[in-house]
Amino acid sequence: MKTMTGRLVAAALVCGGAFSGAAVSAGPDDPLVINGEIEIVTRAPTPAHLADRFDEIRSGWTFRTDDTQALEMDDFENSGMVFVEEARAVWDRPEGTEGKACADCHGAVDDGMYGLRAVYPKYVESAGKVRTVEQMINACRTSRMGAPEWDYIGPDMTAMVALIASVSRGMPVSVAIDGPAQSTWEKGREIYYTRYGQLDLSCASCHEQYFDHYIRADHLSQGQINGFPSYRLKNARLNAVHDRFRGCIRDTRGVPFAVGSPEFVALELYVASRGNGLSVEGPSVRN
């Protein structure tokens, strides 16, 4: 039977690198203050349901190099904000057979969407299920605007989610995991700890058991999603949560669930809950 370290070594070798067993840290004590005014909580007490897993929870920002961290501290340096500004124009633009814009129902985005990113995914009574921000956007487009759905992880959708996240930066993540959301949360937890692919790895393998170690050149974080959508220097674009989930499962040589699927919605709720208490940070900058 393979040991866990053996699995991670195998994963590194697939990518042409090697696993370093030494725990490291890239400026974890540096404060994140955006534009000199938006204070972001990047380290927080561990949520009760993770009390036996971590001493504290940490934003992915604390695992990045000083240079990468600095890019997120100024909106003029954060390339993700280019897409936020594009989405602001779309917010006010009428579309569809109804000729309506987002602003017609929700008003100014800074007011109408304030606080929303902090509590999603959430159980939506009218839908009878847990919904993501992306699903709510597409529901508005089809039912209220008479416009076609956006690609779930396409550039239009991801830019709009980044805009919605940006107006809540600094607010604490606070997704509900009890009541009608509990069964979805439990499904997400099951997926998180399930091993996938030929490398037989789970989300927890990298982001819980071996976080703060290196695998090849990647400094493993706790896998928090409070900073999504995230502008990655690696691919020079905004990246959506489900796109990242899909990539992680592919890295195990497994077959990922579909974006927007019940499985990924459940996983998103669970992973978001692991960051309860951190600040909404999107669009973040990562490697």
Swiss-Prot record:
Binding site for heme c 1: 102, 105-106, 140
Sequence positions that bind heme c 2: 203, 206-207, 248
InterPro entries for the chain: Cyt_c-like_dom, Cyt_c-like_dom_sf, SoxA
Organism: Rhodovulum sulfidophilum (Rhodobacter sulfidophilus)
Biological process per Gene Ontology, one example term: sulfide oxidation
Residues of the signal peptide: 1-26
Catalysed reactions, as listed in the record: L-cysteinyl-[SoxY protein] + thiosulfate + 2 Fe(III)-[cytochrome c] = S-sulfosulfanyl-L-cysteinyl-[SoxY protein] + 2 Fe(II)-[cytochrome c] + 2 H(+); S-sulfanyl-L-cysteinyl-[SoxY protein] + thiosulfate + 2 Fe(III)-[cytochrome c] = S-(2-sulfodisulfanyl)-L-cysteinyl-[SoxY protein] + 2 Fe(II)-[cytochrome c] + 2 H(+)
PTM: Cysteine persulfide at Cys-248.
Enzyme kind, highest EC tier: transferase
Active site, per annotation: 248
Keywords per UniProt: Electron transport, Heme, Iron, Metal-binding, Periplasm, Signal, Transferase, Transport
Disruption of the gene: reported phenotype: Unable to grow photoautotrophically on or oxidize either thiosulfate or sulfide. Thiosulfate:cytochrome c oxidoreductase activity is zero in periplasmic extracts prepared from cells grown on thiosulfate plus malate.
UniProt protein name: L-cysteine S-thiosulfotransferase subunit SoxA
